[in-house]
Amino acid sequence: MKFVDEASILVVAGDGGNGCVSFRREKYIPKGGPDGGDGGDGGDVWLEADENLNTLIDYRFEKSFRAERGQNGASRDCTGKRGKDVTIKVPVGTRVIDQGTGETMGDMTKHGQRLLVAKGGWHGLGNTRFKSSVNRTPRQKTNGTPGDKRDLLLELMLLADVGMLGMPNAGKSTFIRAVSAAKPKVADYPFTTLVPSLGVVRMDSEKSFVVADIPGLIEGAAEGAGLGIRFLKHLERCRVLLHLIDIDPIDGSDPVENARIIIGELEKYSQDLAAKPRWLVFNKIDLMDKTEAEEKAKSIAEALGWEGKYYLISAASQLGVKDLCWDVMTFIIENPIAQAEEAKQPEKVEFMWDDYHRQQLDEVAAEAEDEEWDDDWDEDDEEGVEFIYKR
């Protein structure tokens, strides 16, 4: 299945149903008073995280989602039916952005998590709501309010503990094949990896971590060179980055300059990502003598001003790979993810009263004090039905 990590969709919540103007008319009850019911609330639009999905490709074709409109009120104090909600399922790890405001509405990081992205309109009030001692035959009602309408950008970001970055052909795909069951394509030409991939590294029956492999970066990626930096977002949730350096590039390039290019592109993309823990890993040491590899790795680290520990491995022959994985596992155990407070999800509104409708009634009450209401029981009233529309 094609990997799609971005999609734009339009979500439109349902409008609220209009209130009804009606009067009770039954045999022997000629003046029964108002009995117009309220409209129904409009349906909401929700997003729900689903661990069984791993791409946003469905939303490249289906881009518009509309909830149902609330039904209008009816006579006999009948309230209109509430509009049906719409639930859109997205992969776990999806970030939701309102393109109109640039606001990040939420991150879908857990299976079953729900996020309200468009609220349905409030229902309108029937004329029963406007009756009073001075207005016994109210001919006012309110219309339902429009539902929310948003253009959303969905960004899928992989959930991994460890992220790998480096130049093309640094050996990232070979590494993930060596430590997990993932089988990304491996070849002797640049940009073999075109989409991100995940692998689960199992150290024993109880300990494991997830590693993410993204396409290689080249100089100018921040300006769109190569595959650009669009895949760097998949590393934002990683706890540690493994910076793989080809210790002896086949194209004769300078490993020090290659490493500086990667660091520079990280800083251009995000200071937060550049500040994440980053480990230096020299790959392909099997292509030279052990002593020569150690001396070259030391000189590269010194040229980069690297003061921490670094690793020498060969992903192809798995030399030094196991020790690196155990150190990563230890780091993950010692640095658990901070348990951020979960944002409270908006509860489903069961309407009883709200500021909008209270304002409508207050306005009518104020008018009643300033004007002498006509008691419209006279049969010769030819003014017809009076409507007051409020938005």
From Swiss-Prot:
Q: Which UniProt keywords apply?
A: Cytoplasm, GTP-binding, Hydrolase, Magnesium, Metal-binding, Nucleotide-binding
Question: Sorted alphabetically, which InterPro entries does this protein's record hold?
Answer: G_OBG, GTP-bd, GTP-bd_Obg/CgtA, GTP1-OBG_CS, GTP1_OBG_dom, GTP1_OBG_dom_sf, OBG_GTPase, P-loop_NTPase
Give the compositionally biased regions (Polar residues).
129-145
Q: What class of enzyme is it?
A: hydrolase
Say where the protein is mainly found: cytoplasm
State the similarity comment. Answer: Belongs to the TRAFAC class OBG-HflX-like GTPase superfamily. OBG GTPase family.
Q: What is this protein called?
A: GTPase Obg
Which taxonomic lineage does the organism of this UniProt entry have? Answer: Bacteria, Pseudomonadati, Pseudomonadota, Gammaproteobacteria, Enterobacterales
